[in-house]
Amino acid sequence: MAYPVVAIVGRPNVGKSTLFNRIAGERISIVEDTPGVTRDRIYSRAEWLGTEFRMIDTGGIDMGDEPFLTQITQQAEIAIDEADVIVFIVSAPEGITDADEKVAKILYRADKPVILAVNKADNPEVRESIYDFYSLGFGDPYPVSGVHGLGLGDLLDAVVKEFPEKDGAPKDDSIRFSLIGRPNVGKSSLVNAMLGEERVIVSNIAGTTRDAIDTKFVADDTKFTMVDTAGIRKRGKVYENTERYSVMRAMRAIDDSDVVLVVLNAEEGIREQDKRVAGYAHEAGRGIIILVNKWDTLKKDNHTLTDFQNLIRIEFQYLSYAPIIFVSAKTGQRLEQLPEMIKRVADNHNKRVQSATLNDVVMDAIALNPTPSDNGKRLRVYYATQVAIAPPTFVVFVNDPKMMHFSYERFLENQIREHFDFEGTPIHLIERARK
């Protein structure tokens, strides 16, 4: 589903990142501490009183050597492009500066709600001065302290009130998928090729932001929704070529997808940014397919495909479950396989298994490889049950969860995978003590 997006905007040194981290707090969802997964703090999940949303720290998007005013202008434009609600941060001790007024003028043009937060309002004397900020023209200023957490409740109440109302439309029964990857891996060409291959385009549906377009189509009698095709296709703004902006855009697409297609460039191999966006898809628990694009451009021998597969398995060890497809947007090579594979991964992502069969598999696994012991005490597994889908999540009841070593948990996971076919989806095992 698409979550409301809140962008934090303001000139340098007003405390944007401090406020961002304070609101995110421990609500950032990290499924597991996976080696090789890099987290990017410019985009985060957050929640207030049961309402979940996403936050962007525009100050975290580095514009390189651009002049100061150009940087804050671009950051404000990102907020206007990407957000449903904008939080404009100023500094109480410093008062209104020329840079604040520059940002304000840009935000006036936004057809988006703007909430004014006066940061560093740490004491009553400073808070009394916030009324000067009415002159910026954004209504009531909210005094806050990112460092001490003061005033955040009132600020977040105001933010949540501005979220778009849910329209009550019928639940989307299509499979939602996105193509993610760094610039120049060929996402735009893949989008055009996939939508041009005898597909029935149903409609372009505007998302929660001005330029996020989802494209619906039908293939093999299955309904699909390609998420954020506009975000992949659009070009022209300076910041759209920055790595951190493209990572942020990928994170948003992942959040709104059932299945994620991680696109690699066969000519360039695997880069750190490839790992970053793939790692976020894994942590978000989405179904994943790895696409190696521009496969037609490589000179090949009998070992080329196998060598590239092995490289992917080494560099993306945490994605051992993800199928790999070598494709070419230019020639159409293997693109006809994608709808069927996306559907298969989506089905696996939502698969439920019977408890009786699950426990037979677990007990057979234990007979094959007995549970570990420590100081004469052996781990005892009593039973397992599935508690969630998307991704499939299982609770294993044991005598002592601390005795479940990572390697044995991985063994049980592999046995469950092998029996039930969970290709393309992560699965989670949670150990609990039986009371």
UniProtKB/Swiss-Prot annotation:
One of its GO terms (molecular function) is ribosome binding. GTP 1 binds at residues 10-17, 57-61, 119-122. Residues 4-167, 175-350 form the EngA-type G domain. InterPro entries: G_ENGA, GTP-bd, GTPase_Der, KH_dom-like, KH_dom-like_a/b, P-loop_NTPase, Small_GTP-bd. Pfam families: KH_dom-like, MMR_HSR1. Residues 351-435 form the KH-like domain. The keyword Protein transport does not apply. GO terms for biological process: ribosome biogenesis. Keywords: GTP-binding, Nucleotide-binding, Repeat, Ribosome biogenesis. PROSITE patterns: G_ENGA (PS51712). CDD domains: EngA1 (cd01894), EngA2 (cd01895). Associates with the 50S ribosomal subunit. PANTHER family: GTPASE DER. HAMAP family: GTPase_Der. GTPase that plays an essential role in the late steps of ribosome biogenesis. This is GTPase Der. The lineage of its organism: Bacteria, Bacillati, Bacillota, Bacilli, Lactobacillales.
